[in-house]
């Protein structure tokens, strides 16, 4: 059996930035450090940070006065931000800059009273934070996840609409939903640049290429990782068997019966060490050394928050 690795795969710039922020804050302030929600959706990363003294919370009242709190990469609503700012807390923001871009689009639409349609997944923390940027009661913000949602949607003024997209949404699915929105609301406006982030787009394209060259696809990522789940769905849509695995021990040897070429990729929140462990596990089942497919070289780097630069001097 051969192993082919998707390229690119694994950590994106937003995840690397978020982890870097937390590690620097721990080095400066010492534990415990509080993070609102899981920093990124990967159990290995979360458990590693927890062992370093990070306490993950959902409610702000769980954080004691005088403590340090960090917002996760998914971002938070205006209400959460206001609640934190009203407390005696030291605040650092690990929100992905590409999520912040979407937040700013929503805030501008809210200020102008433009009704906003968010293409995203119900219950995802990024979606909750994005919806929480809109506070104009004369307008409104609406969440759609499917074509059915589009056809059933009711708005106040069909001539004063815009749409935005969750950064980790499926590229193909969002394209179909946007087409439906434009069909139903001809005057709807979209962002100047697409909201789905570069890493999501690149990893989905890499999986398309991977499925063409392999018999099975293993996606390294946690069950609550939106972008990892999209990679599995995309691979399965090609008719190839595809599995989401949190770690190497999740692999079942019977998956590999009759398989000649195994494809491996990783979601944007999955560290490379997990991919290396998967390769070793596959080799224990008789696979050869891994080869990497040609792909797009990502050079994106996001700067740290300004207030962390000041403290770090």
Swiss-Prot record:
Dimethylallyl diphosphate binds at residues 41, 74, 124, 225-227, 269. Disulfide bonds: none annotated. [4Fe-4S] cluster binds at residues 12, 96, 197. (2E)-4-hydroxy-3-methylbut-2-enyl diphosphate binds at residues 41, 74, 124, 167, 225-227, 269. InterPro entries: LytB/IspH. It is an enzyme of class 1 (oxidoreductase). Its EC number is 1.17.7.4. GO terms for molecular function: 4 iron, 4 sulfur cluster binding; 4-hydroxy-3-methylbut-2-enyl diphosphate reductase activity; metal ion binding. Keywords: 4Fe-4S, Iron, Iron-sulfur, Isoprene biosynthesis, Metal-binding, Oxidoreductase. Binds 1 [4Fe-4S] cluster per subunit. Pfam families: LYTB. One of its GO terms (biological process) is dimethylallyl diphosphate biosynthetic process. The active site is at 126 (proton donor). CDD domains: lytB_ispH (cd13944). It catalyses: isopentenyl diphosphate + 2 oxidized [2Fe-2S]-[ferredoxin] + H2O = (2E)-4-hydroxy-3-methylbut-2-enyl diphosphate + 2 reduced [2Fe-2S]-[ferredoxin] + 2 H(+); dimethylallyl diphosphate + 2 oxidized [2Fe-2S]-[ferredoxin] + H2O = (2E)-4-hydroxy-3-methylbut-2-enyl diphosphate + 2 reduced [2Fe-2S]-[ferredoxin] + 2 H(+). The keyword Iron applies. Its cofactor is [4Fe-4S] cluster. Catalyzes the conversion of 1-hydroxy-2-methyl-2-(E)-butenyl 4-diphosphate (HMBPP) into a mixture of isopentenyl diphosphate (IPP) and dimethylallyl diphosphate (DMAPP). Acts in the terminal step of the DOXP/MEP pathway for isoprenoid precursor biosynthesis. HAMAP family: IspH. This is 4-hydroxy-3-methylbut-2-enyl diphosphate reductase. It comes from Baumannia cicadellinicola subsp. Homalodisca coagulata. The lineage of its organism: Bacteria, Pseudomonadati, Pseudomonadota, Gammaproteobacteria, Candidatus Palibaumannia. The gene is ispH.
